[in-house]
Curated annotation (Swiss-Prot):
Taxonomic source organism: Kocuria rhizophila (strain ATCC 9341 / DSM 348 / NBRC 103217 / DC2201)
Pfam families: tRNA_m1G_MT
Annotated protein name in UniProt: tRNA (guanine-N(1)-)-methyltransferase
Any coiled-coil regions, as ranges: none
Protein purpose: Specifically methylates guanosine-37 in various tRNAs.
Classification lineage: Bacteria, Bacillati, Actinomycetota, Actinomycetes, Micrococcales
Amino acid sequence: MRIDVLSIFPEYLEPLKLSLIGKAVTDGLLQLQVTDPREFATDRHRTVDDTPYGGGAGMVMKPEPWARALESVLRAGSDTTARSGSTAATSASAQQATRLGPDDDAAQPGDAGQGTAAPDYARTGGTPGAGRAASSRPVLVVPSPAGEVFTQEVAYELAEEEHLVFACGRYEGIDERFIEWARDEVRVRPLSLGDYVLNGGEVAVLAMVEAVTRLVPGVIGNPESLDEESHTGGLLEYPVYTKPAQWRERTVPDTLLSGHHGRIARWRRDQQLERTARRRPDMVLALDPATLDRADLAVLAAEGFTLRDGQWQRCSPAPSEQAPEGARDMA
């Protein structure tokens, strides 16, 4: 997978060099490049913003530097893909070497309109996205409080892509014409972390990139851990414990110490259902009843959720007024 981030504050993305993502880049599982649109500005002051038409507070990001920056990373990405495909066809042993890695070509400041164009650029007069099937085009993610909510499901969808580009807007946002133009070159996906506003897109991109890349095969050492996390299967994760068994007058639930795998699995499932019902009742209402067994339904009923004509009904009193979370132990 190749990931490009467009930001006028590239230092903000330094944490992506750390931990598992940094290791994945070193190992060649990911290619990660940060590009500053300021390097594509045309004036000596490298201006990337201006006042909004129609008046109002704040500044708006100018479209041309962003368009040039995007064109640059699309050329670099397409060139990498073309070379990878050619190398893979040469020999089976070369396939491993063609995985995207830190030594592949990447967008460099000021290279808009330069470099070796990929074949489809040459056929279409230098337009990065033209002549390419829509489903094969890179995805441009634009963090925005006006976008669709970024969820674990969206993370899984993005993890299937070969090339992601993130545009970190600032101030009042990027000129809408850039977004409209980009739709002819890439698949544009405005995404929001939630119902709140940040100073810029960098914080959101850090979260999104981590959520997406950890789903790429090989990035997480134990892929089975992904199956037990919150939001997998529509439920929150169960509580976890480690040694010592007793700490400051608090003990690990007896079931987890029993060694009985069936009881442990049931306890964890019950905890997932309880926690989801109390913290995220909206997720319970979205559960498919066909995926639940009798024991599941009993736990949810105790938390105030019952089925009527195949539809979830929430009873009173609210689950938060019931027994403390985690009080039930099956030992």
